[in-house]
Regions:
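Catalytic Walker B motif of ABC-type/P-loop ATPase nucleotide-binding domains
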Residues: 153-157
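Conserved ABC transporter NBD signature motif
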Residues: 57-71
């Protein structure tokens, strides 16, 4: 069951080609990692998938063919910059966002409380976000993205700048969502994190998909001893592997 489809997408900014011929599907229940170095195109791709950017050519659609920008309520987005209102409490930030999608406050609160328990954020929901640490702001952004019940959660470097404990908590939440049948797209440049969290990894290099498959298959198909070695091999060579060739 395909929830999100990226088809032959090219995205340019002036003469700069940020993404070049990117295609893949996201299926229900998958946790998919977008892995690449800084500037590889991960954030641009996530902004296209969330409907913030429009492709120069190609399409980004939901499974039924609807362009993503017309159905943003199906998506929960945690950008690299959390964009919280500092004069509002954590819950007020979450509630404001949920109301934009027509979600009843009681429904949003129930969802928020469920995940706040997992993130150890229950006691912080009534606090103003102005004094929040990076980790607390990131957790609030996660709760905000989940409160309206999205079909797909899009995370842009969700553990960047977090301490070890906060990063583990975020990864544990992704695992919880996965166990409950949720669908997550997880951008990271941390290979160990992608291997730990994701069922499937899409390696992006210079705006091109270099590989798409499970961590084990990427290692196997490159005759590597580790995912790090496989990544180096794939991004240094011009070989391109498609998911059709690397089936998990």
């Amino acid at each position: 069951n395909t929830l999100l489809q990226v088809s032959d997408v090219i995205k340019t900014f002036g003469e700069v080609i940020a993404l070049n011929g990117v295609s893949f599907n996201i299926k229900s229940g998958e946790v998919v990692g977008l892995v690449g170095s800084n500037g590889a195109g991960k954030t641009t791709l996530l902004r296209l998938m969330s409907g913030v950017y429009y492709p120069t050519s190609g399409n980004v659609t939901l499974g039924d063919g609807t362009p993503v920008h017309k159905m943003r309520g199906d998506l929960g987005v945690v950008p690299e910059s959390t964009g919280l209102y500092s004069r509002l409490t954590a819950w007020e930030n979450i509630r404001y966002h949920s109301r934009l999608y027509g979600i009843d406050d009681a429904v949003a609160w129930k969802r928020t409380l469920k995940f706040a328990q997992s993130l150890d954020m229950e006691e912080n929901l009534s606090r103003y976000t102005k004094g929040f640490s990076r980790g607390m702001r990131q957790k609030t952004a996660l709760l905000r993205a989940l409160a309206h019940g999205p079909k797909v959660l899009l995370l842009d470097e969700p553990t960047a700048g977090l301490d070890i404990t906060s990063a583990r908590t975020v990864r544990a939440l992704v695992e919880q969502i996965k166990q409950e049948g949720g669908t997550v797209v997880y951008s990271t440049h941390q290979l160990f994190e992608a291997q730990q969290v994701c069922d499937r990894i899409i390696i992006i290099h210079n705006g091109v998909v270099k590989a798409d498959g499970s961590p084990a298959k990427l290692i196997e198909e490159t005759n590597s001893d580790s995912l790090e070695e496989a990544y180096v091999s794939l991004t240094q060579e011009k070989a391109r592997m498609r998911f059709e060739d690397i089936k998990s």
